[in-house]
A protein has these predicted regions:
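Interface amphipathic segments
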Residues: 1-288
């Protein structure tokens, strides 16, 4: 059985023909939303932007220059500490934070942007000192950056890490990096992704990625394709010295859905050691399999 006390809470809304402003305070959580539009104009703009967004989802095509004019001009700010209803809800799922700040805005002279920063984010026994997110418009693109930074003595193998990339039309890019306390890179690789109404295609980049602190080589023109009729096609061959990870469709195509997986001398210890709470496992992995998917 769990109970939670009711914190002092206030909510206010002011609107006229020129502007709308909403404020809410509960415990140490504060939210402010403002727009230079009346309530009726705001509702109409939200309906219009929802319709534009739904159209982009239907066509599976991201275009921020098309979405931006449909959005209302607005400014949103949220700040919170440990004593509020949001933290209480998260704690029921074993998540909590010490401090949170977020802001979002869109106006005629500036692109759409959303920023978020949390400090002391915990999940179970894992503590992340600082987590940041930055999502913004750059022309037609929607660009994103997620960052993680830990203080000395906490997760020193992941002193800094980040995920960044963009979405535009029917293409996307995902890049990952990680550095330990000494500044040594453990991971640095990315995926270029395209999609249609029948498939998703991904390619590993760059040609010299890092996995588990080790430099690898990736074959030019590599790809992984998943078709929505559940067929898989691939031509990916990554090597580092005597280590190899390859997944390929057999020459000539083979039977529909045939995939060959070739793993040789793969050292799993360095990569596993980067993850929090990973078991102390080491070894060399090898396999040569023919799969029918």
């Amino acid at each position: 059985h769990r109970t939670d006390r009711i914190r002092p809470t206030s909510v206010s809304l002011r609107t006229d023909s020129a502007a709308t402003r909403a404020e809410a305070v509960s415990g140490d959580l504060s939210l402010t939303f403002s727009t230079p539009q009346s309530a009726d104009s705001l509702i109409a703009a939200l309906t219009r932007s929802a319709r534009t967004l739904a159209g982009q989802i239907d066509t599976q095509s991201v275009d921020m220059e098309q979405l931006k004019p449909a959005l209302p001009d607005f400014a949103l700010r949220v700040s919170a500490g440990p004593d509020n209803i949001l933290n209480s809800l998260l704690k029921s799922r074993k998540i909590a934070f010490d401090k949170l700040n977020a802001e979002g805005m869109s106006c005629d002279s500036l692109p759409v942007s959303v920023r978020l920063r949390t400090e002391g984010l915990t999940y179970g026994n894992v503590v992340l000192d600082t987590v940041t997110a930055d999502i913004r418009q750059n022309g037609k693109r929607l660009e994103y950056v997620l960052g993680l930074a830990n203080a000395p003595g906490n997760l020193d193998n992941i002193a800094r890490a980040g995920l960044y990339g963009h979405l535009v039309r029917n293409t996307g890019q995902v890049n990952l990096y990680q550095r330990n306390r000494a500044g040594r890179e453990g991971f640095r690789f990315g995926l270029d992704v395209t999609w249609t109404d029948s498939l998703i295609r991904a390619s590993v980049t760059p040609s010299d990625p890092l996995f588990g602190f080790e430099p690898w080589t990736v074959n030019p023109g590599n790809y992984l394709i998943y078709r929505f009729d559940k067929r898989v096609e691939a031509d990916l061959d990554m090597t580092h010295g005597d280590q190899r990870f390859a997944i390929r469709t057999p020459p000539g195509g083979g039977a529909s859905g045939d995939i060959r997986l070739d793993i040789a001398g793969l050292n799993i210890g360095p990569a596993l050691g980067l993850f929090p709470s990973a078991p102390p496992v080491d070894g060399v992995l090898g396999a040569n399999l023919a799969l029918n998917l």
